[in-house]
Amino acid sequence: MAQVEYKGTGRRKHSVARVRLIPGEGNITINGRDVRDYLPFESLILDLNQPFDITETKGNYDVLVNVNGGGLTGQAQAIRHGISRALLEADPEYRGSLKRAGMLTRDPRMKERKKPGLKGARRSPQFSKR
């Protein structure tokens, strides 16, 4: 018999995380590596564990993640978004608490594009008076 599996996709900046929750003892695997090997900062690990703290399900699920694109912070927040969506699929009762904490909202902020005639998105070339 196939085991129960809950899936969620999270996005943040240019990162996309495909998350699978399997009932287990709380192991988190990101791209085939342990979470402590993949994310070097404790703050990022705490960040992606927030949905479990809010729903009080820490240690109930093993998390398998495939994430690509962006940097470490964007990836951690994409994983958090994916975990929240997967938890919602596991139990719709969590919607209220996750929504209040802002875990289900896709953060729309992206890098602003470089404009022609400027050095960056907003920085203009150095001005010379003479």
Curated annotation (Swiss-Prot):
Keyword vocabulary terms for this entry: Ribonucleoprotein, Ribosomal protein
SUPFAM superfamilies: Ribosomal protein S5 domain 2-like
One family name in Pfam for this protein: Ribosomal_S9
Annotated stretches, region: Disordered: 98-130
GO annotation, biological process: translation
Compositional bias annotation for Basic residues: 111-130
InterPro entries linked to this entry: Ribosomal_Su5_D2-typ_SF, Ribosomal_uS9, Ribosomal_uS9_bac/plastid, Ribosomal_uS9_CS, Ribsml_uS5_D2-typ_fold_subgr
Signal peptide location: none
Single GO MF annotation: RNA binding
UniProt keyword Ribonucleoprotein present: yes
One Gene Ontology term, aspect cellular component: cytosolic small ribosomal subunit
Keyword field contains Transmembrane helix: no
Family: Belongs to the universal ribosomal protein uS9 family.
UniProt protein name: Small ribosomal subunit protein uS9
